[in-house]
């Protein structure tokens, strides 16, 4: 087998492969012999059909099959011989495949970038530390109460946090527009569900009252036909309901699976959950800084095939998350390219760190992570058992642990500053990092 390789770009390779005619004929004959053993042809007993008849009937098909298999096999042999690491399937262009002659074809493909991760000492990380104070716990209890609020009809004027049942008709330039009308809509004032000015315009309204609201759609409104336009909404208030927060009692505690331990037992469980959330938030923020630092210190070119695969995966994710009748390939690729590029770059860099430092998932950390996740459930022992019986889930946990070990490895070499902050600041979400 003859092989030559041409570098057509930083990552693209054009490999010409020649396969001797003798090897092709050997593969063709092997398939014809297999066919002869089972072929059923009138006038001949099974297995006794002359090879000349078999060849006449089946040679073309056997040759096509042999050529396809040989291209696949010899491509793999060639990349191993040339020590290449393809990052996707090749585009194959046959150059010569006449019967009795050598097969020659060209395979064009991308390879994974070869690089060494460096610049660890240029990475700066701010590592937060915080505690769950009693005041934080009290605030969380209020949040839980508000999440379980009930509304009772009242005859007083509407205030912020009241729930209104309304009918409305919206007009732009004096014309009713699509999606601008509804009946029996429940709206909590101050929730920010409606465009600016709409909810404020209903403060003070009573049941049975009609109000005309003059508002303007935001410039960045999702419907471009309405963005920045003035609108008039005629709103009828059907009912006004005031919020009633539940008492912190046994009935309320049971909603969270906590029984017969009273308010102190409930506070203890909520604190545990807050502490778990705190640990995860701090860990996540450190990880994001480490990943940003690795990207900044190690600019690499990524194979287009990997980028396309990641874009397609994100498209499918988006359809699954948001639903609708749209197909993944109907979503513009540009929407996902930055996120896909970041993910692919990080995947390659993290994999290289694992390789450079010979990292393996730590079994003790795997157990610890499973127990941590299981502790959020009412029957943690069953959750732990489920993980250990599910190899796919175990592999996912191992991957997360290995990524954490990469972060730890980087932290040992990076510049780390510790900072004490409040619980609220520590758990506050940060904006998703953007690709460069």
UniProtKB/Swiss-Prot annotation:
InterPro entries xref list: PPIase_dom_sf, PPIase_FKBP_dom, Trig_fac, Trigger_fac_C, Trigger_fac_C_sf, Trigger_fac_ribosome-bd_bac, Trigger_fac_ribosome-bd_sf, Trigger_fact/SurA_dom_sf
Keywords annotated in UniProt: Cell cycle, Cell division, Chaperone, Cytoplasm, Isomerase, Rotamase
GO cellular component: cytoplasm
UniProt keyword annotation of Isomerase present: yes
GO biological process per UniProt: 'de novo' cotranslational protein folding; cell division; chaperone-mediated protein folding; protein transport; protein unfolding
Residue ranges that the Swiss-Prot or TrEMBL entry lists as coiled coil: none
MF (Gene Ontology): peptidyl-prolyl cis-trans isomerase activity; protein folding chaperone; ribosome binding
Domain PPIase FKBP-type: 161-246
Alphabetized Gene3D superfamilies for the sequence: 3.10.50.40, Trigger factor ribosome-binding domain (3.30.70.1050), Trigger factor, C-terminal domain (1.10.3120.10)
E.C. number(s) listed in UniProt: 5.2.1.8
Any Pfam family matching the protein: Trigger_N
Catalytic activity reported: [protein]-peptidylproline (omega=180) = [protein]-peptidylproline (omega=0)
Subcellular location field: Cytoplasm
Primary role: Involved in protein export. Acts as a chaperone by maintaining the newly synthesized protein in an open conformation. Functions as a peptidyl-prolyl cis-trans isomerase.
HAMAP family: Trigger_factor_Tig
Family to which the UniProt record says this protein belongs: Belongs to the FKBP-type PPIase family. Tig subfamily.
Domain notes: Consists of 3 domains; the N-terminus binds the ribosome, the middle domain has PPIase activity, while the C-terminus has intrinsic chaperone activity on its own.
UniProt protein name: Trigger factor
Gene that this sequence comes from: tig
């Amino acid at each position: 087998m003859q092989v030559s390789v041409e570098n057509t770009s930083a990552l693209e390779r054009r490999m010409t492969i020649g396969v001797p005619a003798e090897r092709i004929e050997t593969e063709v004959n092997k398939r014809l012999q297999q066919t002869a053993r089972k072929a059923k042809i009138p006038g001949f007993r099974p297995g006794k059909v002359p090879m000349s008849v078999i060849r006449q009937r089946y040679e073309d098909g056997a040759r096509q099959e042999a050529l396809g298999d040989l291209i696949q096999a010899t491509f793999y042999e060639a990349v191993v011989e040339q020590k290449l690491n393809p990052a996707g399937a090749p585009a194959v262009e046959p150059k010569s495949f006449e019967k009795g002659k050598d097969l020659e074809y060209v395979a064009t493909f991308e390879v994974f970038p070869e690089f060494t991760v460096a610049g660890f000492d240029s990475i700066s990380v701010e590592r937060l530390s915080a505690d769950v104070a009693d005041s934080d716990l009290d605030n969380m209890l209020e949040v839980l109460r508000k999440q379980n609020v009930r509304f009772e009809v009242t005859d007083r004027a509407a205030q912020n946090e009241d729930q209104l049942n309304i009918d409305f008709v919206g007009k732009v330039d004096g014309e009713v527009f699509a999606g601008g009308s509804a009946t029996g809509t429940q709206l909590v004032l101050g929730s920010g569900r409606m465009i600016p000015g709409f909810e404020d315009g209903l403060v003070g309204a009573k049941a049975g009252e009609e109000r005309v609201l003059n508002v303007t759609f935001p410039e960045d409104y999702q419907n471009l036909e309405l963005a920045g336009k003035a609108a008039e909404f005629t709103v009828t208030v059907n009912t006004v309901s005031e919020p009633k927060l539940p008492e912190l009692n046994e009935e309320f505690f049971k909603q969270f699976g906590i029984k017969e331990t009273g308010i102190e037992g409930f506070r203890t469980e909520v604190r545990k959950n807050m502490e778990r959330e705190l640990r995860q938030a701090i860990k996540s923020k450190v990880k994001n800084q480490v990943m940003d630092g690795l990207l900044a210190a190690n600019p690499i070119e990524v194979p287009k095939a990997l980028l396309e695969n990641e874009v397609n995966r994100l498209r499918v994710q988006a359809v699954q998350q948001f639903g609708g009748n749209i197909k993944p390939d109907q979503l513009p690729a540009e929407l996902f390219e930055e996120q896909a590029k970041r993910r692919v770059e990080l995947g390659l860099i993290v994999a290289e760190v694992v390789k450079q430092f010979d990292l393996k998932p730590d079994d003790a950390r795997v157990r610890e992570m499973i127990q941590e996740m299981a502790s959020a459930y009412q029957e943690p022992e069953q959750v732990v058992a489920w993980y250990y019986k599910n190899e796919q889930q175990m592999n996912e946990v191992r991957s997360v642990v290995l990524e954490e070990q990469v972060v730890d490895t980087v932290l040992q070499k990076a510049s780390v500053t510790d900072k004490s902050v409040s619980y609220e600041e520590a758990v506050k979400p940060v904006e998703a990092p953007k690709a460069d």
